[in-house]
Amino acid sequence: MLQKFQNHINANFGFLKDKKLLLAFSGGMDSMVLVHLFQKLNLNFALAHCNFQLRGAESDGDENFVAAYAKLNNIACFITKFDTSNYSKENKLSTQVAARNLRYNWFNEILEQEKFDYIVTAHHADDVAETFMINLSRGTGLDGLTGIPSQNGNIIRPMLPFSRKEIENYVLENKLKWREDSSNASDKYLRNKIRHHIIPVFKEINESFLQSFQNTLEHLNQEQSLINDAVQMVYEKVVSEENQQLKINISALLHYKNHKAYLYQWLNKYGFSAWNDVYNLIEAQSGKQI
């Protein structure tokens, strides 16, 4: 895996070699492998660990493990604690969403204060498949089915081509120690249900499921790019932006056969959910602007 990872970095992330990187390090298997690989490649990085205080002594054990590893390997390390439960209640968020918000807000604070260039996370191929299934089960457009991007602004995910099985093998080959999150064994969370019960069925049907899945995502991303070009072209003809408002020329929009699809692409990012009401309003306003 080391050689494959090095080739992947050289081909797709060569720009990281002279950058200052912040690695998200939970102490779990995936991030442990990422840290070890970055050490092998002699990249310039520090570690960042969040103690979300959701698992009592186990969370503190993760923090202690990370701190000890950083000290032993002479790696700079940033550690913080969050009252995640209280934050999620105050902001009416699920625990997972609350933890994500706290995590990335803090990472970005470190980037700004300490002049890091990128955040690096250990998401891998199985994570992408799980996210696809989650979005599919909840209902989504093509955007929700095109996977986790390898780069999203200042967030880098260099392990996306690698499967959980490859990561497990790397741990065994290099005799790495890591921390197991006990919540990963529970089916309380949808992601875990999919990981434990759905993905294994696909792998049983097709031993090369993850590779086939990645090929499919590549095709979907290419098609999404074509759609984005078409959506932008129609947007420029139909929509005007005035005083931070969008004005849609309904007559012009209805000229296009797939006007509902264009509308979805333009407005979905604003959190619309009652799409039937929106579509009915559009058709009722034919010849006008909204």
Residue ranges and their predicted role:
Residues 1-199:
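Core alpha/beta nucleotide-donor-binding catalytic domains of modification enzymes
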